[in-house]
UniProtKB/Swiss-Prot annotation:
Name of the coding gene: nuoD1
Top-level division of the source organism's lineage: Bacteria
Organism: Streptomyces coelicolor (strain ATCC BAA-471 / A3(2) / M145)
Protein name: NADH-quinone oxidoreductase subunit D 1
Subunit structure: NDH-1 is composed of 14 different subunits. Subunits NuoB, C, D, E, F, and G constitute the peripheral sector of the complex.
Function description: NDH-1 shuttles electrons from NADH, via FMN and iron-sulfur (Fe-S) centers, to quinones in the respiratory chain. The immediate electron acceptor for the enzyme in this species is believed to be a menaquinone. Couples the redox reaction to proton translocation (for every two electrons transferred, four hydrogen ions are translocated across the cytoplasmic membrane), and thus conserves the redox energy in a proton gradient.
Classification lineage: Bacteria, Bacillati, Actinomycetota, Actinomycetes, Kitasatosporales
Length: 383
């Protein structure tokens, strides 16, 4: 039998077709800052995607090496400006581990409380901004209303609305103001009472569900391959949370309240659902911390430190479950008053790499929905 050869002949516009390269950003409003996406398109389909980062690189890790252990806290809370308290917390935990320092119980519980309030502030931003990117303007106003309630109590305790500078090596800057816990409890209750608006207005919206259901599905294998963490990973069925699996601060005593929310679909909708459910749980954890603080007797919230603080020679690694995922802090000391090296492992950096896996095969129209559902901060990527 004579073998046959098949030949495909293009007619008209298909006679010669070339892929188009499209640059999204680095000043596009959907990129949350100066992130650039280099897309290769075949018609309206994305065939390959490359996130191009570095436009906001400020050399934070190098700057750490020229500042002492008190000063680096000021730099540490700036790369992810929506999670400032959690960022500075990770740095002081690494230094305290290097020093072998025990932190007073009251400071431990206060840190846990403020970390969870910071988590809610972070999540509310994305609960409002993500529907906005898909064309729904109303939720962002509700989100900022609730953020303002919590920012007021955070500002009262620390003096800052964004960069709190409340952590210190060995504890906290100072104790909580008189009557603050009562006001904080009222703020948590007020926010909780109005959180249903996101269930009704966003998750109950068929247009939102149509834009996000089945779009940008990330497999558990890809989560492990790219080091994705946080709500994005848990939406793909990866049941891992450092607060439960390797407790730090007071999370070991909060296991009955802590609920690790997971989904299995791994799409944009699942990621939003995880973020919303995690916000509800963070409010519950904040209440549990307030209850525990009410039981504690007055006491110190920091340790006395020498005028010149030096960490012993060696290295250590601390990691925390930040609002956007796992942040790691690798500290190397040569016994001086400044770190020899402080390497940051930021959640946004790893999470955004998954775009190379998520975008190929999808429509350009779905790109913004997928990008926004990764819940990242550009400063956290570039540092």
């Amino acid at each position: 039998m004579t073998p046959t050869t098949e030949t495909t002949v293009g007619i008209g516009g298909a006679a010669e077709s070339t892929d188009m390269v499209l640059n999204i950003g680095p000043q596009h409003p959907s990129t949350h800052g100066v992130l650039r996406l280099k897309l290769v398109l075949d018609g309206e389909r994305i065939t390959s995607a490359e996130p191009v980062i570095g436009y906001m690189h400020r050399g934070a890790e190098k700057l750490f090496e020229a500042r002492d252990y008190r000063q680096i806290i000021m730099l540490a809370n700036r790369h992810d400006w929506l999670s400032a308290f959690s960022n500075e917390l990770g740095v002081v935990l690494a230094v305290e581990r290097m020093l072998g320092m025990e932190v007073p119980t009251r400071a431990v519980w206060t840190r846990t409380l403020l970390a969870e309030l910071n988590r809610v502030l972070n999540h509310l931003m994305f609960l409002g901004s993500y529907p906005l990117e898909l064309g729904g303007i109303t939720p962002v106003f509700y989100a900022f209303r609730e953020r303002e309630v919590l920012q007021n109590v955070m500002e009262e305790v620390s003096g800052g609305r964004m960069h709190y500078m409340f952590n210190r090596v060995g504890g906290l800057k100072e104790d909580l103001p008189a009557g603050w816990t009562t006001r904080a409890r009222g703020a948590v209750a007020a926010v909780r009472s109005r959180m249903d608006v996101f269930d009704d207005l966003v998750l109950g919206n068929e247009i939102f569900r149509g834009r996000t259901r089945g779009v940008g599905a990330l497999s558990a294998e890809a989560v492990h391959a790219y080091g994705v963490s946080g709500p994005v990973a848990r939406a793909s069925g990866v049941d891992f949370d450092l607060r439960r699996d390797e407790p730090y601060l007071a999370y070991g005593e909060l296991q009955d309240t802590l609920k690790v929310v997971t989904r299995t679909d791994g799409d944009c909708l699942a990621r939003f659902e995880c973020l919303l459910a995690q916000t509800h749980n963070a409010l519950d954890l904040a209440d549990a911390c307030l209850d525990r603080l009410a039981e504690l007797a007055p006491g110190p919230v920091n340790q006395r430190l020498p005028k010149v603080l030096k960490a012993p020679e060696g290295h250590t690694y601390a990691w925390t479950e930040n609002p956007l995922g796992i942040n790691g802090y690798y500290l190397v000391s040569k016994g001086e008053k400044t770190p020899y090296r402080l390497k940051l492992r930021s959640a946004s950096y790893n999470n955004i790499q998954a775009l190379a896996e998520l975008l190929p095969g999808t429509l350009v129209a779905d790109m913004v929905a997928i990008l926004g559902s990764l819940f990242f901060v550009v400063g956290d990527i570039d540092k």
